[in-house]
Design a protein with these regions (language model features):
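Bacterial N-terminal signal peptides
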Residues: 9-22
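Feature for soluble, non-membrane regions of globular proteins
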Residues: 27-237
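Intrinsically disordered, low-complexity segments
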Residues: 6, 19, 29-32
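N-terminal secretory signal peptides that target proteins for export/translocation
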Residues: 1-5
């Protein structure tokens, strides 16, 4: 009998300690509408959708190791440091980009957030044994917007070559038509809530180890051998 009473007292004491612990207090405050909020986990480097050597010989494993493992990772790490302790902590990436676009006092946050998004989108714009032509609705929209697939390809490569300095070349949907646009540095169509279908990174770190100053050759390899048209088509609205 004494043993049972002792066990009961132990359980009651343990329960009381749990109820007043910081974890439970924060959870109760959050659920009751208090200003105290539980901070969401920081951003993490997203996994590549393929192995680092999967895009060879068009993009080498060495380039992918630096581009993904160093550059992309640095943007993620910088973003986490910059938003920590601010009203942007715990917000979705797209919201951070749209709230900081054009804000001079939040330029560093925008640049790193946009580059995290742009790079993640770039990886999913490619696949091993990609390229060729799209089919179905996407092909029809390309032919309607550019006259033919070959004209689209020429314009896309030319736009990427003409982009001065670092930046990105995009295929975006504008209602029932498609457009090729370029953005400088970290800028991104999502900042203007545009619907991007695919992108190619024309920062030098994306191609210089493999192509040196031959950006056109890199862009041509992208459209001929790497574009994931299924992924692009899935983004149509």
């Amino acid at each position: 009998m004494k043993l049972q009473i002792a066990k009961s007292l132990f359980l009651v004491t343990t329960l009381m300690l749990l109820l007043v612990s910081p974890i439970w207090v924060r959870a109760a405050e959050y659920s009751s509408g208090s200003t105290t909020q539980i901070t969401a986990p920081p951003f993490a480097l997203p996994a590549l959708p393929y192995a680092e050597n999967a895009l060879e010989p068009y993009i080498s494993a060495n380039t992918m190791s630096f581009h993904y493992g160093k550059h992309h990772r640095a943007y993620v790490d910088n973003l986490n440091k910059l938003v920590a302790g601010t009203d942007l902590a715990g917000k979705p990436l797209e919201e951070i980009i749209q709230r900081t676009a054009g804000a001079s006092d939040k330029k560093a946050i925008f640049n790193n957030a946009a580059q995290v998004w742009n790079h993640t989108f770039f990886w999913t714009s490619m696949k091993p044994r990609g390229g060729g032509q799209p089919t179905g609705r996407l092909l029809g929209m390309i032919e309607k917007s550019f006259g033919s697939y070959d004209k689209f390809e020429s314009e896309f490569v030319a736009a990427g070559v003409a982009q001065f300095g670092s930046g990105w070349v995009w295929l975006i949907q504008d209602g029932d038509s498609l457009k090729i646009v370029t953005t400088s540095n970290a800028d991104t169509p999502i900042a203007q809530r545009q619907n991007a279908l695919l992108t190619c990174d024309v920062w030098e770190h994306a191609y210089y180890l493999d192509y040196q100053n031959r950006r056109k050759d890199f862009l041509q390899a992208f459209v001929d051998h790497l574009v994931d048209w299924d992924s692009a088509a899935s983004r149509l609205k």
